[in-house]
Amino acid sequence: MSKLKITLKKSKIGRIEKHIRTCEALGLHKIGQSVIKEDNDAIRGMIRHIAFMVDVEEVK
């Protein structure tokens, strides 16, 4: 399976609780922080909820 590099680009301040919890579930706590996760449907769904807040890159 491929992996995804997810980077938080926008602040969680002022966002609805669902977006904040999704960021934290992905392991994103600070602006500019990146995490590498497996590319699967669950992670893709979480990214879709907060797509306006994150950048996503495929890592080989």
Swiss-Prot record:
Annotated keywords: Ribonucleoprotein, Ribosomal protein
UniProt-listed InterPro entries: Ribo_uL30_ferredoxin-like_sf, Ribosomal_uL30_bac-type, Ribosomal_uL30_ferredoxin-like
GO cellular component: large ribosomal subunit
GO terms (BP aspect): translation
CDD domains: Ribosomal_L30 (cd01658)
A UniProt-annotated Pfam family: Ribosomal_L30
Origin: domain of life: Bacteria
A single GO molecular function term of this UniProt record: structural constituent of ribosome
Transmembrane segments: none
Keyword Signal: no
Subunit structure: Part of the 50S ribosomal subunit.
Family: Belongs to the universal ribosomal protein uL30 family.
UniProt name for this protein: Large ribosomal subunit protein uL30
